[in-house]
Amino acid sequence: MAGRGSRLRPHTLTTPKPLISFTGKSIVQRLVEDIVAICDEEINEIAFIIGDFGSQVEKDLKKIASDLGAIGTVVYQDQPLGTAHAILCARESLKGNVVVAFADTLFKADFKLNKKNNGIIWVSKIEDPSAFGVVKIN
């Protein structure tokens, strides 16, 4: 959640992109609810990695976690140094099974987690991948 949402202006001038409401719920709330629904284990903590969005955003994110019976942890990424750095900033929360998701991406989590695998990456095939990271599969 550390990005600025420049492509959704003017909406993101006052609201961070993941907190923009989409049919009554914020994008991040929908994402978190979908992920919690596919997890077979109890979710104890939901960590949100954010830039400098302010205390109201912290409260909103903690409420999303609380409403799902989890502790909401807010971690700050002070410099926009990429996804790996953002995850590193949240290293204290990386215990046990972990799901990493982009808070501004809408998708329906209609899959199941397979605990037999050490790691899983969910990807989507798109026509023009030039603006994205690319995953090659066999």
Regions found by a protein language model. Give the residues of each.
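Short intrinsically disordered, low-complexity coil segments enriched in acidic
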Residues: 1-3, 46, 135-138
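N-terminal nucleotide-binding beta1-loop-alpha1 segment
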Residues: 1-13
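Active-site glycine-centered loops adjacent to acidic/histidine catalytic or metal-binding residues
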Residues: 3, 104, 125
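Conserved N-terminal catalytic core of the sugar/cofactor nucleotidyltransferase
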Residues: 7, 21, 25-106, 111
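Conserved beta-strand scaffold positions in the cores of enzyme catalytic domains, especially
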Residues: 19, 74, 119-121
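Conserved core of the sugar-phosphate nucleotidyltransferase
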Residues: 107-138
